[in-house]
Amino acid sequence: MPSGSKSKKKKSKSKGGVKKHAVEKVAPPIEAEIMDERDESDYPTSRVIKRGPNGDVIVESLPDKSTSGKKSKKKGKLSDLEVSESAKQMGITLDSHWESLSPDEKKNILRIEKEEVLEIIRNYQNDHNCSCSVCGRRHMAMNQEMERMYNLLYELEEQRDPDMNPVKFHLGIIKELQISKNKQILDQTEGPNDNTTHEEVVKNFLSSDIADKLKEEVHQFKQKQLSKQECNRPSSLANDNIEEEIPCAQIPQANEEAMTKDIQKTLEQLSVVEPVSKINVIQEDDLGEIKEENKEYLKFTESFISSQPKIAQKFIQKLDENPCMKAITDEVMQNSSYEFLDALKNLWAPNLLKIVESEDDDNLVNLNETLDPIEFTTMLHHGNPLSQQDYYDLQGAISRKVVNAFNFENRKLEHLSPLEVELFGRFMSSDQDNIFHNMLLEAYNERFKEEPFKMMSNIPQIIKAVATLTNLDGRMMDDVDENHFTSEEERYDDDITDYSDSEYEDYDSEYDDIDNGDIISDVDEPFSTLKSDQLRVNYDTNSGNINHSDNYESNSRLREVTDENEENLQYDTPQEKYNYSDHGKDHGTIADEDEDSIDEGYESSIDDMERLEEGRRLIQIAITKLLQGRIMESYHEKEADSNRLKLLKELEEEQMKKKEKEVKKIKKKEKEKEKRRLQQLAKEEEKRKKEEEERSAREEQERREMERREAQRKKVEEAKRKKDEERRRKLEEQRKREEQQEKQRKAKEEQKRKREEEKKKKEELERQLREEELMKKKEEEERLLREKERAEILKKETELAMSMKENHSSQSLSIQNQFFSNPQNSNIGMQNYFNNDLDNTNAGLGNGGPTNLGVRKNSHVLGLTQVYSDKANNSPGKNDDNNEINNEILNIINAATTAKSGSRTSMDMQALLQPPFTDNVNDQIRSSNLINDQASGMNSNGLSTNFHSPYGSNVFSGENQLSNNLQNDILTGLNADTSSTNLASWTSLPALNNLNANQHILSNNQTPLHQQKGTSPISNTMMDTKRDYLGDELSKLTTMLTTNSLNESPAFSSSNLQSSLWNDQNSSGKTPLGSNTTQIPLSQPAFLGTEPPVHRSSIWGDSSASMFNFSQRLSVPTNSNSVSSQTVPNQNIGMGSSFTNPSIWSTGSDFNVPSRDMNSGVAFTNSFSNTSPRNQFALNSGSMLQNQSQRQNIMDNIRLLSNSPQNNGYIPIDLLYQSINKQSTSDFPSFLNNVIDLERSHNYDLVKDQTGVINGVRVGSENRPVSTAFSNFHQNMDPTMKGPEHLSNSIPGTARNFEGNSYLAKEATMNIIPSSSLDR
C-alpha cells in the first residue's frame, strides 16, 4: 500500500467536500533530464523512428526546446544503477506474480486469437493516423494487407504442421522472438561490456549527424507539401505533446535497438510460460479449477457489486446460467475499461491541435504553454498556483462532473459550464493524462458499480456527448471506433473454452528442454532496463481501482517501441513517409495521384519476402503488447486485491480498536455509574438512619407527651367525678324536699277539691230537679198534640191502604220515576210524609199499644207514599194540607233546635241522660239571652246546659272559651231555616223519637231520674276531676270536628271505638248492661259475629256508671203502653244495636239495650218506632242537594279571599264564615263539616293551633273532583236499608214501592252521623 494513502484519507475527511473514492495524493515522480545542445532543431516531433543495421526498430528521443527549460527545473537525474536495480526488482516481482497465478489465469493470459491481434493493429493505425478519405482507404488497404500476411504466415506454418491452430501459431511466433533474444544475449556476452556499449549508444543517439539528417528530411517535407497541406498530423503531434507535458521522468537515453530486443525477448519468454504452466494445470483436478474460478468471481463481485455474501453467491449463479454475462464479467475483470480512457484521449488530443495554423516551432511551443492546465489553473486562481493536493482534487471533481452529467436517455451531457468543459479539455491534453484517466475510470466505475454490464456499452455515447458539447470537428468522431466499445458479448462470440487442453499437448515435447530457471531469467532480463517508477502501481484504497500514474512511462515506452516498428514497416523509404504525411484539410484532386505514387513506391521498394517479414514482426509486436497488457493487468489486479485486503484488514483493526475503545469507555462509564450509585446508596442509607433516629426521638417525645396528658386527664376526670357526685347528692336532697312539699300541696288540694265537688254535686242536684219539673210540663203538652195528629194520620192511612194494594205495580214505578226526575219535589213530599208519620206513630203509641204498631207503621208508610205521590200529580188541594202539616212539624223542630242551641259544659252531658226538657224550658231559653243568662241556664263553670254538639261533646266549652261574637254567629246559624241548612246534622229522626218516647214515659207516670238519685247517684270523684281534663277534652273535641265528613259513609273501627279519648281506658271495654249491647256501624249488617266495645256516651265520668244509671232509669216498670223487645226487631232498624245517639233530642244512651242484666224481662224499645229510616229520610232528603250548593259557595269564597294580596293564600276561619253568612245563613258546625270535606276532596290545607283548633284555610295544590251525594250510595248502604223487608209481612207490595226511597234514606242517615266523630 502506498505511503501516502493514509494521509490522503485523513485530508479527504477533513475537507468533507471530496468523495471517498477521490484519487489519493500521489507524490510527484522523479524525472530524468536530458540536455539537448541542438537548439536549432525544427523537427516538430519529439522522437525519431528508424531501422537499425540488423533490421531492428530504433527509437531516438529529441526533447523539445520549450520543454527543456521546464525539465531543467525538475529534480536531478536518476542514476543508471538505480534504473537497473528497479528493473531487476520489477522482474523478480513479475516472476513471482506469474508463479502465483492459477492455471486458469495463465491459460487466459496466453490464449490469443487472430482477431485480437488484428484488432490491436487496426486500433493503432486508427489512433495514429488522420480520418480523411485517403487515409481511410489507406487504412483499409493496410488492414487487408495485414490480414493477408497473417493468413499467408498461418498457411506456411500449417504446411509445416498440419495440426496448427491460431493459438499454437501465436505461441510459435513468441518462441521465435524468444530464440532471437537468447541469441542476442549470447552475442552481447561475447562483445564489449554493457557500460561501454551503453555509452556508445547514447553517443550515437546524441550525434549531430542523425539530427541533421532528420532535419533535412523535415524541411523537404515542408517545402513539397506547403501548398497542398490542409491538415496536420494530429495524431503524432498530439502524442508527442502529451508525452512532453506529462510530469514524469523521461525515458533514459539508451540503445533503442537493444531495448527493442529486450522487449521482444520478454514477450517471447512470457509466451513460453503458458504451455509449461498448462502442462501442470492439466494434471490438476477439475474441481479445483472450478473452485478457483468461483473464488475469483466472488472477489470481483464483493469488490464491484456487493459485499454481502448472499448477493455475491446469487450473482455467481447467474453467471453460470448466462454465458454472455460471464464473458462480459471476464472482460471487465481483465481490462478494467481502459478503452474508455483511450477513447477520451484520442477524442481530445486532435481537437486541441486544430487551432494551430502555422508549422513553426514557436507556435508549437506557444500551443503547449497555452494547453498547460497548471498554468491555466494558476491564472484562474489570480496568479497563485494551486497546491498539488488541490490540483488533484480539482481533477477528481471535473472527472466526476463529466461522468455524472451524461444522460443516457437523450445521449447528452447536461449541466456542464463552459469553464468545466475547458478544464476537462486541458486535463485530457496534459502530460498527466494517465492520472486524469484514472480519475475518470474511478468516477465511471462508481456510477456504474450497481450495473457493471452497462459500463462498456456506454463509453461511445459519453464520448459522442463530450464531442458534441465541445463542438469537435466531425472528422474526429470518425476516429472513434464504436465497434471497439461494443458489448463483450460480440467480442467473445467464440468462447475461448472451446480449446481443450489437448491443444497444448503438441507443445510438451517442444518445450521440455526449457528450464524453469531459464524462463525466469528470460523474464527478468527484459525488465531490467525499466525504472521502478515506471512499473510501480498505485491503488485507490477506497474504490479498489488501479492507479496507473507511476507506470505511465513504461506504457509509453512500450507504445513508442510499437509505433516505431509500425512506422519502420510502413515508411522504409522517405517517399513512403512523404506520401503518408502529405495530407491536408482539403486533399483536392491530388488524392488519386498520392495513392498511385504510394502504390508504385510500395511495390518498387519492398519485395514480398521483406513485406512478409515486416508483417511477422508487426504481429510479434501486437502479441507482445497484448501479453504485456494482460500480465500487467493481472499484476495490478492482484496488487489491488492485496491492497484492498490490507485496507480491509486495517479497517477491521481500526474498527476493533474503536470497539475496544468504546468498550473501555462503556466499562469506565459503568464503573463511574456504579461508583455514583454506591455513593448515592451510602448517602441514602445515612439519610435513612438519620431520619430513623429523628423519628424514634420524635416518637419518644410524643409518647412522653401522651403519658403526661393522660395523667393530667385522669386528674381532671377525678376532680370532675367528685364534683358530679357532690352535685348529684345535693340534687337528690333537693328532690326529696320538693317531693315532700308536693305531697303536702296535693293533700291540701285534694281536700279542697273534695269540698268543691260536694258543693257542685249539691248544686247540680238542685238544678236537675228544677229541669225535670220544666221538662215534665213540656212533654205533657207535646204528647197531647202528637196524639191528636197521630189520630188524623191513622184515619188517612186506613183509607189509602186499599187503593195502594190495587195499584201496586204502576204506583211503584211512578214514584221511582218522579223521584229521580225531580228530586227536590220528592224530597219535600217525603219530608212531609215523615213529619206526618211522626205524629201518627206517636198517636198510635198513645192509643193503640204494641200490638198494632207494626201494622200502623207499614200502612202509614205505604199510604203516605201514595198520598204524596197522588198529591204531586193530581190534587193540589191535598198538597196544601200536607204542606200545612209539614210546616207545623218543622216549626216544632226549629223551636226545639233554637231552645237547645246554647253551649253547655261537659258536666251537662249527664243531664242528657235524664228525661228531656219540657216546652216551657225551651220557651224560656228561646226568650232569654243564651250567652248572658247564667242564673237559670248556666252551671257553675259558666257554660250553657242547653247546647249539645251532635258529636257527643261541647264545641265551645272549656276555660279557653270563644268570644261572644263567634258564639252569636254560631247561634244565628243554628236558628236558620232548615230548608237552606243541613238540619240533619243537628236534628235527626232518632232525636224526635227519643223526645216522643220520653214524653210517653213521663206521661205514664215514670219516676224521674232525679228521684232515683238515691239508687244510682253520680260519682263525686268524676265531678271533682273535670277541671283537670277540661283542656285535653277541648283539644280532642276540636280535632274530631276537623276530620268530620258528611258525604262519606261512617266506617267504625273496633280499635277506634275502644281507644276512647274522653273516658278512662279501664272502662272503655266494659258492657254496662250486658253482652248484647254492641255497636254495629251503619255500613255493615245488623248482626255480626263480633261484639265491638260499647261507645261511651259521656266524656266526663265512667261510662259504666252512666250506662248503669241509664239502665236503671229505663228499667222502671211501665204500663200497658210499654212495648216489648220483640215488637220491632233489631234487624229492621237502620242503626246499629248499640249505637250511641249524639242528637240533642236523645238521652245520650242506646235505645236497643235489653234489660237482661236488670232481670226485669222488659226492654225499652219504643224508641225504635220513631227511628226508622223513613223518618230519617224525611228530614234529611231536603238538605242533601243543598250541601253541594253550600260547598260550592265555600269554594267560591275561598278563591275570592285567597286572591287578595293581603291574605296571600291564607284565609282565617272566622273571616270565611262571616263571608258565607252574608250570602246564605248556615250554622257553624255544618260549615266546619263542609270545610273539612272540601279539605279532603279539593286538597285544601287547614291551619290548626297547638290544641287542634282550626284557625284558617290555606289553598293547596290542584283541587280534586267533588264527590256527589250519590257517589258511594249503594256500596256504603247498610244491608238492612236495601229493602223494606220488615214491611212486607204486614202490607203486601210495599217493599217494592219503598225500594227507591230507602236509598235516599240511607244516604241521609250516613250524613247525620259522621264517621270521624264516632272513630274519635
Swiss-Prot record:
GO BP term, example: response to salt stress
Comp. bias regions, Basic and acidic residues: 579-590
Q: One matching Pfam family, short form?
A: NST1
Name where it's found. Cytoplasm
The protein's UniProt keywords, in alphabetical order, are: Coiled coil, Cytoplasm, Stress response
- Bias kind Polar residues: ranges: 541-555
Q: Point to the regions of Basic residues compositional bias.
A: 1-22
Q: Tell me the domain of life.
A: Eukaryota
Q: Where does the record place a coiled coil?
A: 637-807
Q: Which InterPro entries match?
A: MAP7_domain-containing, NST1
Compositionally biased, Acidic residues: which spans? Answer: 33-42
Name where it mostly resides. Answer: cytoplasm
Annotated region (Disordered), positions in chain: 1-85, 541-598, 656-766, 1048-1073
A Gene Ontology cellular component where this protein is annotated is: microtubule cytoskeleton
| Task performed by this protein | May act as a negative regulator of salt tolerance.
Q: Which PANTHER family match?
A: MICROTUBULE-ASSOCIATED PROTEIN, RETICULOCYTE-BINDING PROTEIN HOMOLOG 2A
The family annotation for this protein states:
Belongs to the NST1 family.
Q: What is the name attached to this protein's record?
A: Stress response protein NST1
Q: Which organism is it from?
A: Candida glabrata (strain ATCC 2001 / BCRC 20586 / JCM 3761 / NBRC 0622 / NRRL Y-65 / CBS 138)
